[in-house]
Amino acid sequence: MKSLLDLFKQFTPDEHFNAIKIGMASPEKIRSWSFGEVKKPETINYRTFKPERDGLFCAKIFGPIKDYECLCGKYKRLKHRGVICEKCGVEVTQTKVRRERMGHIDLAAPCAHIWFLKSLPSRLGLVLDMTLRDIERVLYFEAYVVTDPGMTPLKKFSIMSEDDFDAKFKEYGDEFQAKMGAEGIKDLLQSLDIDGSIERLRNDPTGSELKIKKNTKRLKLLEAFKKSGIKPEWMVLEVLPVLPPDLRPLVPLDGGRFATSDLNDLYRRVINRNSRLRRLLELKAPEIIARNEKRMLQEAVDSLLDNGRRGKAMTGANKRALKSLADMIKGKSGRFRQNLLGKRVDYSGRSVIVVGPTLKLHQCGLPKLMALELFKPFIFARLEAMGIATTIKAAKKEVESGTPVVWDILEEVIKEHPVMLNRAPTLHRLGIQAFEPILIEGKAIQLHPLVCAAFNADFDGDQMAVHVPLSVEAQVECRTLMLASNNVLFPSNGEPSIVPSQDVVLGLYYTTRERINGKGEGLIFADVGEVQRAFDGGAVELNSRINVRLTEYIKDKQTGELVPSTKLWETTAGRALLSEILPKGLPFENVNKALKKKEISKLINVSFRKCGLKETVVFADKLLQYGFRLATKAGISICLDDMLVPTEKPGIIEQAEQEVKEIAQQYTSGLVTSGERYNKVVDIWGKAGDEVSKVMMAQLSKEIVTDRHGQQVQQESFNSIYMMADSGARGSPAQIRQVAGMRGLMAKPDGSIIETPITANFREGLNVLEYFISTHGARKGLADTALKTANSGYLTRRLVDVTQDLVVTEQDCGTHSGYLMRAIVEGGEVIESLRDRILGRTAADDVLHPENRSVLAPAGTMLDEDQIDELEVAGVDEVKVRTALTCETRFGICAKCYGRDLGRGGLVNGGEAVGVIAAQSIGEPGTQLTMRTFHIGGAASRAAIASSVEAKSNGNIGFNATMRYVTNGKKELVVISRSGEIVIHDEHGRERERHKVPYGAVLAVKADQTIKSGAILANWDPLTRPIITEFAGKAHFENVEEGLTVAKQVDEVTGLSTMVVIDPKHRGSAKVIRPIVKLIDASGNEVKIPGTDHSVTIGFPIGALVQVRDGQDVSPGEVLARIPIEGQKTRDITGGLPRVAELFEARSPKDKGVLAEMTGTVSFGKETKGKIRLQITDPDGAVWEDLVPKEKNIIVHEGQVVNKGESVVDGPADPQDILRLLGSEELARYIVDEVQDVYRLQGVKINDKHIEVIVRQMLRRVVVENAGDSTYINGEQVERSEILNTNDALRADGKIPARFTNLLLGITKASLSTDSFISAASFQETTRVLTEAAIMGKRDELRGLKENVIVGRLIPAGTGMAYHEARKVRENMDDTERRAIAEAEAAELAGQAEATEANEGAAAE
């Protein structure tokens, strides 16, 4: 019977649509939606509470108030369904139709729709080719517009004031027509000839760029009107639709008052003004009165649609702006973000979390009361099935009474039914995980300690929410995809997320440390059991060095079987005991060392790769238990004597104070400028602080002990504080330094460093001044945290929005393009090894052995750990890999180009939403870091400035192609190139390290010289930038005039004077003159650049201190001037987050550098006022020139040859320039490197591929250069996949395809310009997006995730992908196939029903 009842349920399958189209409604359409005209402004009768007839809540128009009952009560109940009562005119039906039936208002005068008028750019203005100002004057009855000039010389579309109109009317009489208000605009729109206009615009010969741009916009709009069949005059409303009353409810409050939606107020005003206007028109009232009323009506309609967009917002009784229709859908509390994307969830609860150290990784403790409430429906069903309760009501009673049988059933129901735990803020996918619940007493949820890292949870009062998956499918998904034991790696970098922390680390570290001369040192044991007995009996200490025979199981590479191998190990008792819990296949050497946090992480990683997921999870749990037990036994705690203040501290501080005094004297005697003094003081104190912390760590970390033979030896200290920091359990050297060293330099809130440091530490205590200074830093930390959390959240939101529709849609796109990857080396150190960069990527070409050219990895293999080991042995130093950016899949990405799914460890699965994962991986650490700025307490963590580079390895010196240098008078080699690099090769000629060498550095090595590691390669003055001459001659100054371009600074002690170049802004006159020096040779001529007829000209930049005198002889490599470098600010991610946002928004930097537009020779043309004319001539003689402001630093000189895309003016690069000149590969490299720099500074690891995915989305649109035979317009922006599909079709027909260029959009722009208007509207600028979409008559294909969430379907990713594919298959079937399937299903059902009946019959007998 039950199955029969299900047939009557209203079933609305979501199969019925596969796209959503938006458009503009014609008056006929609005009337067809309507169930009647609303004529009166009344709502309900205040005595009877029944709706007034023809009013805003009229039951006749909108439907009955009670289910199946008319208003007057003549017809009641289901039997009269569909009857229309003749007395009150109400149809007898369900009351829910009041949510869907619309009404309408016939406007007495047309009104323009404010969205098409005021949403910029004004669509009405574009269509009519009039300015917004003019249209507004017409609409609000301040001016006339000529709608039909007749035979007069007047122009159509021309605007005239009232006086003009009167004059013209006297002159021409009725020969022309001019109107005011929306009627005039409507006439113009109606008379618009769209085809003719399109023809005219396409053939417009204009050359002005502005005109072309405007024409393109108009053309696009008119084409859209033509294509979508929307008539422009519909932008002016004649009929206004009325929202169904239940969507703008009127709710009685207690005390006889009513709460109402603002919309009712707005509608009421429209209706009032409309009726009044209608009456005035019937009475033939004077024009001026009617005109005023029409204006008021237009304003009322404006307010209803979008209150406050024009003029003052309409306010209610309480002076608050009323919420209009537009406000209902936009913003955080609008329809999209509040109700469609952010729904609240049933079957959920929340509570405080406490630690559950006894749980297994896949379990959580759920309070009994909570479980009872959450699993109620399951319990009811079970009670009914067992026959304990006959009805749901009885079952409810049973549960409420809490009988023992209920608890038994609860246990049964909960068994193997996973629940989801979520901790807000959910910053990445590990913020929600599934666990199997274990019933516990109490009211707090118990959480497994190892998942805390993923949730970022601690137990200081955090709360978590529980959600119950109801359907079987949901439970299966929870178990397979979301169970905590299936999510052991971070999706952002592939590192394990279940790494122990704090106490556990401390316990494991203590166990695996060795102590010299511990009890039982040197004993030899036969097996671990013996060690255990000896340890229990007290014969041997945990940390004693002993020898043990151990058996380990190693996986054979060929067969993959575990082979036992036994040998005698030198180890400690603790490590031997720990070996018991190692999974088979994990070598003992992995734990035969002091286990710090990093080592433990590595251990779990190795276990995952070698032994698989299941073993690793079990191992992690055992490790946890072991660590807790031993941390308890170790009894490590903190005491005051552990904080050792180094004895050398007073000496170091005294010396620093001495140095600071010297600098102060130099300053008073004028040897150094104020800025230099500040820099040097900060530097001295920075070094002193580091020195103190060095001595302190040396003292803390080592202790002298006596070994077995009575010798004094040094061993690592067992100082508690040192062990906590060293193991990575808690604290860091930076924090210990503040406790036992000196606090050091503090930062002001603006990031600059206070030059008086805090010399005390917390153990000694701070004095009042020091305490006051330190509050500065603390306050900055707190303020930062609050502000940055919001910023970071917004960044994540933009990232998710731009990538949400990127899903793995196919296995292999078959491309052979990719990027060459090599290790990132900076300052001679390998920052990121080649291994880290290519792990889990697919090789684009065969990887060959560098010596014998044999294939190590064929193209298309995913490089895993073992293969990369082979590559490293062979010495491969660059590999071409496929990337997200070179993938050729349309509308998605292929698994091969993406490579390994970092969160699972294998090739990425089809349907994985890699876009969202990338966004989370980049956004999550942003938030994490900003929440952590204040942990260093503002202690300035500035790097001491480098002043030299030294070799890290032995090898041969080589210079890169751009390195240039001259020999100066002292026979030193002085670097005169900006991008010179020293490269060190090993004996095989492989590059080992690469060092950037700044301009003005003195080289300590020559090319092809062999050096040992540690040798100095080059050194320079870190606090100034020099200006150097490359040629010899006599210095001849031009425009170097004291008081005009330079100022004299006299040193009082020595009487020497230096000249400083003044900033043009501070000069009284001569703002455009640039001080320069030329060189004169022996015969009195100007020295020329060899091979050209340009004279050598060297400019002095602003703030330069001139080092030579006029007429002095200079030799090559001599310093002519030096520029002091400004003070350093402290760096923390605060600077970093906006930097990341800036990169992803592809903003042009403020003082951006200039890149060479082509390859050629540099020359300087005639200077203009305040600017230098920089020219580049290519070999064919074409010239490109740029005017550079004089204050900019030009880093090329006359006659230099530059390559296209090389920097010619100093400054940060503009991503748009990089894309245009160097292509998308270089751009991607630039963005990836810059973003990684920011995160690397904070020690955060993110895989490059996530950033590449974002860049792919930033490059997903292109600009049409030449439309060919396509329907595109030149200059139009199109989705890349779409234009590629179009071009394929055109080529197939033998037509000319469209040509296009790459376009780089920032993430906000890219999100808004997506083809899906639903996604764009729910992101930002809702009004503008919807206006545009409506005019274009856009179709949303519902490709992305967001659109599908909004329309309430499964997302086309993951398990939803299969559902969508099946749907497509069903859609492509013809009706006969469909009918056949339906009939087969029906027959099967019938068969089942008969079988059931037969069974029941048999049972009855």
Swiss-Prot record:
Residues noted as binding Zn(2+) 1 in the record, renumbered to the chain: 70, 72, 85, 88
Gene Ontology CC, one term: DNA-directed RNA polymerase complex
Pfam families found in the cross-reference section: RNA_pol_Rpb1_1 (PF04997), RNA_pol_Rpb1_2 (PF00623), RNA_pol_Rpb1_3 (PF04983), RNA_pol_Rpb1_4 (PF05000), RNA_pol_Rpb1_5 (PF04998)
Enzyme Commission code: 2.7.7.6
Transmembrane feature ranges: none
The record's free-text note on cofactor binding: Binds 1 Mg(2+) ion per subunit. Binds 2 Zn(2+) ions per subunit.
Catalytic reaction equation(s): RNA(n) + a ribonucleoside 5'-triphosphate = RNA(n+1) + diphosphate
GO MF annotation: an example: DNA-directed RNA polymerase activity
Residues annotated to bind Mg(2+): 458, 460, 462
Domain of life: Bacteria
GO terms classed as biological process: DNA-templated transcription
UniProt cross-references to InterPro entries, sorted A to Z: DNA-dir_RpoC_beta_prime, DNA-dir_RpoC_beta_prime_bact, RNA_pol_asu, RNA_pol_N, RNA_pol_Rpb1_1, RNA_pol_Rpb1_3, RNA_pol_Rpb1_3_sf, RNA_pol_Rpb1_4
Enzyme class: transferase
Record key words, sorted: DNA-directed RNA polymerase, Magnesium, Metal-binding, Nucleotidyltransferase, Transcription, Transferase, Zinc
Cofactor: Mg(2+); Zn(2+)
Residue sites binding Zn(2+) 2 per the record: 813, 887, 894, 897
Protein task: DNA-dependent RNA polymerase catalyzes the transcription of DNA into RNA using the four ribonucleoside triphosphates as substrates.
Subunit organization: The RNAP catalytic core consists of 2 alpha, 1 beta, 1 beta' and 1 omega subunit. When a sigma factor is associated with the core the holoenzyme is formed, which can initiate transcription.
HAMAP family, A to Z: RNApol_bact_RpoC
Record family assignment: Belongs to the RNA polymerase beta' chain family.
Protein name: DNA-directed RNA polymerase subunit beta'
Gene: rpoC
